[in-house]
């Protein structure tokens, strides 16, 4: 997704489309780098508009912009996006949609951050310098060039379940490790053409800006990220292999942007296959083959209790959500009760 402003485009026929009966949950991924000096003042208003419209997910806001993924009904998502556009510092922005039959988030969060995507390097500004955007329709030709080194900027656990043909995996656990990878493994004199990609485009805004600052001149990145590529490029023409990891309860999406074949270990958050779920090391909510030997007994006990609470909530037909949202909901309920009480007293006073 570039910082240029365009409207969302209807998905091609090969992608699962919105259906008011079945695929009736809209999942909207968005970001925008912008000068957002008074961002702290908008945390509560944004959270309230999300709660009012029963929209779930997480939005990060910082002085450098906004980033996140939200989900809800068609009307709910439209209302939240309309409000975000009404904020002067944000204005118009591009976003990507996919559709599912179940709410992929449990919680509603708006977080104040130092960065909307954390690289941990001072003074990296995508509004000043960024790589060259490459549209999905032109991506295959670029990455087929033997002079181009193709780098997946995502974390190792994301790369392992799907990536582009011939892409380099930096083997990072977090995006903060990417600058160190560049310093150790890449050289502007040797790597003349560098192409980069990530899930939705935001990490590449930072990584290409960083690369240019390090002296790499010919740096490209996939506009709109993997999700836009999967949306626009038919599977028959695709150079993508596997699923794409997403940061919600779907865990991954396939080439049609439908829920993929992976589940997630709620203890370590790693994506796991159906085969791994048959392993003796897999205990739902507690451990999997990736973390069975890493968690302490205390951690496992905490994971068991969390799973127990989630099961109880599910039986009650409720979502097991965090205390931050519960606090906000309770405060708003209390405020409404107090407002009604004051209105009743005012009406009684008039009657007297």
Swiss-Prot record:
Residues 144-238 form the Rhodanese domain. Its EC number is 1.14.-.-. PROSITE patterns: RHODANESE_3 (PS50206). GO terms for molecular function: oxidoreductase activity, acting on paired donors, with incorporation or reduction of molecular oxygen. It holds the Pfam family Rhodanese. GO terms for biological process: tRNA modification. The active site is at 198 (cysteine persulfide intermediate). It is an enzyme of class 1 (oxidoreductase). The keyword tRNA processing applies. Keywords: Oxidoreductase, tRNA processing. It catalyses: uridine(34) in tRNA + AH2 + O2 = 5-hydroxyuridine(34) in tRNA + A + H2O. The keyword tRNA processing applies. HAMAP family: TrhO. Catalyzes oxygen-dependent 5-hydroxyuridine (ho5U) modification at position 34 in tRNAs. Belongs to the TrhO family. This is tRNA uridine(34) hydroxylase. It comes from Psychrobacter arcticus (strain DSM 17307 / VKM B-2377 / 273-4).
